[in-house]
Amino acid sequence: YRDDGRPLHLPELKNIKIVPLKAIKYSYNLVVLPRYLRKHHAFYVGLASDMLMTRRSVVVLHDIRPLVMDTDKGFFRFKFWFHCLSTKWFARRVFTVSDNQRHLISERLGIPLDKIGVTYNGWEHLQNVQPDMTVFDKLPGVKKKEYYYALGSLAGHKNFKWVREVAARNPDKTFVVAGGKDLAAFGSAEADAAQNTSNIFYPGYVTDGQNKALMQNCKGFLHPAVFEGF
């Protein structure tokens, strides 16, 4: 992984070695990572739609939303397009999360269908996660079983504008929106507006255990996204 000084939020891994590689932004994918792969004769499995420059690889494109929806800033869309092209040029095989995306990727990027596989989103790992009730220490205004819960970023396609509008129409109700709030790729208007809704609480990043606690104790789970790869 690219070691840029930020903390890693990972569970205990027994059979996977974590290798930090010092790199500055795009040099990681363009220079540092390919050099490491060649040196160790390694096969690359890219799970985050990252740009790559090695043919011994498979890549996951969760979806290609930035190419079909106008919800991102121009530079992010250009960067994502370049990532997709590098996947087309170098990856031996591509995986995505639905048959809908499989056909869309083939249509938009010109990748043959027989080169694109489908691996559905997983949830089974949560069965072995213990709920971490300490998350409520960060939410003193939230009562168990009396709030509505949503999880994700504040990116435009997640449609959290809908949650904010519903919260504004129901000031007696409580809402919790967990997840990252970094809108560098989307602009700050949504974040500024969201912070002005007093009955919405933002715990920020939550662990799997904290997420499970919030899901188990909410009155209802909200998922207003208009695009998730299916």
What does each of the following model-derived ranges do?
Residues 1-230:
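Carbohydrate transferase catalytic cores enriched for Leloir-type hexosyltransferases
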